A protein has these predicted regions:
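Membrane-interface extramembranous regions
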Residues: 1-149
Length: 149
């Protein structure tokens, strides 16, 4: 829920600041700024909630902590890439692929009742997918519209 709030609030703030400062609004840029802010937030989670994030990674994959930190770093790099005219398109394409690839980890987290912030097995369970899957589709669509369309 926090990433969604950050996405919408930063989008609205970006629009307001553009309108006040420039008397015009670049909605695509505002959308990329909002997506970048959201990615900074989610990247922070990779460093703050390491144990819970490790629990999301399938058991057959070794070096779970490496994956957690690496994806956090990738999210930070993507946040930067979204802000430059020369890189936002490739960043958007790679982000869409990333969002598709991480969905199984979110599904596994729900199936195992993983509470990411606590690193425990008392999370909301499968009912969370009714929110998470549409949210992931929103992130993919948002990324497409502000970077590739």
């Amino acid at each position: 829920m926090k990433p969604l709030i950050v996405l919408f609030v930063v989008f609205a703030l970006s629009i307001g600041i553009m309108w006040l400062a420039f008397s015009s609004i670049n909605y695509m840029l505002a959308g990329r700024i909002a997506l970048a802010a959201m990615l900074v937030l989610t990247a922070f989670g990779h460093f703050k909630f390491v144990e819970g994030m490790e629990m999301m990674i399938p058991d057959f994959l070794p070096f779970k902590r490496f994956f957690v930190y690496s994806t956090g770093i990738l999210e930070l790099l993507a946040a930067v890439g979204l802000l430059f005219d020369s890189t936002f398109e490739i960043t958007g394409l790679l982000l869409i692929i990333f969002f598709v690839l991480i969905l199984p980890s979110n599904i596994q987290a729900s199936m195992r009742h993983i509470n990411i912030e606590k690193g425990t097995l008392d999370g909301p369970g499968l009912s969370y997918l009714w929110f998470r899957v549409p949210l992931q589709i929103l992130f993919i669509g948002w990324t497409y519209f502000v970077t590739l369309r």
